[in-house]
């Protein structure tokens, strides 16, 4: 019985420590870094607020600073010209392009898709996102692609309008994880999956509370049982 209680305590505490952002980063947390440093140059997440990134371990100060660096539409001035203001944590993570026309102009006529629900709407979900990111290849002889198209074997039509976004070592993970192309593709796919399914993070938080409760109850039960055993004649 003692061994069972001890194992329960150790297992619960181990799971608890694994779940804490301050102790160890998760693929989704690393994926947020990839989004910030790579994806956000062309893509937005209109259905996600900056403040939602707290679920991925981003501190309130980091959220405010990130948001404040972005300018979002804020009506027009007295001359009818568009105005902007710094974003706040309550604002959505908009596309970096001020309008669709400029977005298309900068990308050979194609508008980079919003990533809020991509892992939900794309056939194959996060696995397909990862495959696309890892399936760029040189264009075969005899195959001609239009300007702004890149050969990619993960797609039925074998081309995509997005240039290869990931390169080994292009960023540094704070937890020391090596930023290989495969690792970054795995991480950002996990992040986009969690973004598309926002209740996943909430379930993890609830699970963290449950694990904490179970660990404390196991310790109290163990101590109470020891006390009962010692009090026996």
Question: Where do the language-model regions lie?
Answer:
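Bacterial N-terminal signal peptides
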Residues: 7-19
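Boundary at the C-terminal end of the N-terminal hydrophobic targeting segment
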Residues: 22-24
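Sequence/structural segment immediately N-terminal to covalent heme-attachment motifs in c-type
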Residues: 26-45, 208-213, 217
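C-type cytochrome heme c attachment motif
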Residues: 33-45, 94-98, 111-120, 131, ...
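Mid-length scaffold segments of soluble, non-membrane domains
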Residues: 106-145, 151-153, 161
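Extended, hydrophilic extramembrane loops/domains of integral membrane proteins
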Residues: 162-197
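Juxtamembrane/start-of-transmembrane alpha-helix segments at the extracytoplasmic/lumenal side
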Residues: 196-214
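Juxtamembrane interface at the cytosolic side of transmembrane helices
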Residues: 203-206, 217-233
């Amino acid at each position: 019985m003692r061994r069972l209680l001890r194992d329960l305590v150790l297992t619960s505490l181990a799971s608890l420590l694994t779940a804490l952002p301050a102790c160890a980063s998760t693929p989704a947390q690393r994926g947020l870094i990839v989004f910030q440093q790579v994806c956000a140059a062309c893509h937005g997440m209109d259905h996600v607020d900056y403040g939602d990134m707290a679920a991925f371990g981003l501190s309130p100060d980091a959220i405010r600073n990130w948001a404040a660096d972005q300018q979002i539409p804020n009506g027009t001035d007295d001359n009818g010209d568009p105005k902007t203001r710094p974003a706040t944590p309550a604002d959505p993570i908009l596309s970096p392009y001020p309008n669709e026309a400029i977005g298309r102009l900068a990308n050979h006529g194609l508008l980079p898709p919003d990533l809020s629900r991509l892992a939900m709407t794309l056939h194959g979900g996060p696995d397909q996102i990862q495959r696309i990111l890892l399936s760029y290849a040189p264009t075969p002889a005899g195959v001609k692609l239009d300007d702004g198209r890149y050969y990619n074997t993960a797609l039925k039509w074998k081309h995509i309008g997005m240039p290869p976004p990931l390169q080994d070592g292009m960023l540094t993970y704070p937890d020391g994880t090596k930023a290989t192309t495969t690792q970054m593709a795995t991480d950002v796919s996990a992040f986009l999956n969690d973004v598309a399914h926002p209740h996943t993070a909430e379930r993890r938080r609830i699970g963290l509370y449950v694990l904490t409760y179970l660990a404390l109850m196991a310790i109290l039960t163990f101590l109470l049982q020891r006390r009962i055993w010692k009090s026996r004649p």
